[in-house]
């Protein structure tokens, strides 16, 4: 008996609820589905709105490779496993099997912006679909440059942009994906030049957030600031922080994202070991947000937090994963992380690999998606 063929609209409606990683496995099932997943921007937009998000932690190894991390917080014994590295071929190499050496990675909307040390280009990559876009920097390249990725979240059709900036310079440039062109943004209100910016930036709904410190102040009068770059208006702004961040003196402050709608900040008071984790309400257009305290801890003296430490929070379970610092005299070949809960219990887990983070591993979160990249006049490559 032959089953009746379902209407196209019904098939698309069903597929729009299937997680992105499962759709990848279905790509070879039907040529029509493959075209739908690869080229249909309308379906991509609907799928982004309806399908359940899959949050995948990633780390960078000492070999400049990205590796997914499986974290199990269920049961009485948490566990962590670093999976095999993800391949990103370097099309500019004479060796067809050569990998692109990644020293920094920035996630936005299912895309990874990857840079390589002392390399005058960067790549924007969708690991799920295999699509890459390589951007040459040419004469504008210098070793102090950093890059972030975003889009105008007020537009139905996302137009992606990358911003380049130098931590030691006030000049910034925007790269437009749709036109494959650069332009200087010198008419925006920027944070004061005396701000030190932490290198850990996070994207949320197309905009980028990171912490800064007023360099004119000295301990114990340091005060942190949460900075936002809006890719729609192309302006910087300041976002309110929870009460512990608004007082003088602190030992550490670290930023992270929770899901795809909230920010989290970890703050350790300077005078005590008390450490608090705060979470925002859902981030909207306004720079004023409300914060709620999720955890309050008193870590042991040998458990150190400092600026820029990577951490991931499970708000529902009230548990977070944070990277263990390496002491100056430690010579461990492999890195470790702590799993920390509201019972003030710190569980030490081994990474099993040596990561690129120097004194501490770097962990970020990636959300697989079908999102497509504007490719006007650019170099595009798809790896299946």
Curated annotation (Swiss-Prot):
Residues 1-46 form the F-box domain. It comes from the Eukaryota. Pfam families: F-box, FBA_1. InterPro entries: F-box-assoc_dom_typ1, F-box-assoc_interact_dom, F-box-like_dom_sf, F-box_dom, Gal_Oxase/kelch_b-propeller, SCF_F-box_component. Gene3D superfamilies: 1.20.1280.50. CDD domains: F-box_AtFBW1-like. This is F-box protein At2g07140. It comes from Arabidopsis thaliana. The lineage of its organism: Eukaryota, Viridiplantae, Streptophyta, Embryophyta, Tracheophyta.
């Amino acid at each position: 008996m032959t089953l009746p063929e379902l209407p196209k609209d019904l098939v698309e409606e069903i597929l729009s609820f299937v997680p992105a990683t499962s759709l990848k496995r279905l790509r070879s099932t039907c040529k029509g589905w493959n075209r739908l997943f690869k080229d249909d921007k309308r379906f991509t937009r609907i799928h982004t709105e309806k399908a359940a998000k899959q949050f995948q932690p990633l780390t960078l190894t000492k070999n400049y490779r990205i590796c997914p991390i499986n974290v199990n917080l269920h049961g009485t014994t948490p566990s962590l496993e670093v999976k095999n590295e993800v391949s990103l071929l370097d099309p500019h190499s004479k060796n067809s099997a050569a990998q692109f050496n990644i020293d920094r990675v920035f996630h936005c909307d299912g895309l990874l912006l990857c840079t390589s040390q002392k390399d005058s280009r960067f790549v924007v990559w969708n690991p799920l679909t295999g699509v890459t876009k390589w951007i040459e920097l040419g004469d504008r390249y210098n070793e102090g440059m950093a890059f972030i990725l975003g889009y105008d979240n007020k537009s139905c059709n996302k137009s992606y942009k990358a911003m380049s900036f130098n931590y030691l310079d006030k000049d910034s440039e925007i790269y437009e994906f749709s036109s494959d062109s650069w332009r200087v943004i010198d008419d925006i209100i920027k944070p004061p030049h005396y701000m030190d910016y932490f290198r850990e930036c996070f994207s949320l709904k197309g905009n980028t957030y990171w912490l800064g410190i007023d360099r004119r102040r000295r301990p114990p009068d340091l005060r942190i600031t949460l900075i936002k770059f809006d890719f729609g208006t192309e302006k910087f702004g300041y976002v309110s922080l929870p009460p512990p961040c608004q007082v003088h003196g602190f030992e550490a402050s670290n930023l992270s994202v929770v899901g795809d709608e909230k920010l989290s900040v970890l703050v350790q008071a300077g005078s005590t070991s008390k450490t608090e984790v705060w979470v925002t309400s859902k981030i909207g257009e306004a720079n004023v947000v409300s914060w709620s305290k999720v955890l309050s801890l008193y870590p042991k003296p040998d458990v150190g937090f400092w600026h820029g430490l990577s951490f991931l929070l499970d708000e529902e379970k009230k548990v977070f994963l944070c990277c263990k610092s390496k002491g100056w005299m430690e010579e461990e070949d492999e890195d470790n992380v702590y799993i920390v809960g509201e019972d003030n219990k710190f569980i030490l887990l081994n990474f099993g690999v040596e990561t690129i983070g120097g004194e501490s591993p770097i962990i970020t979160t990636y959300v697989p998606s079908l999102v497509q990249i504007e490719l006007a006049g650019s170099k595009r490559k798809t790896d299946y």
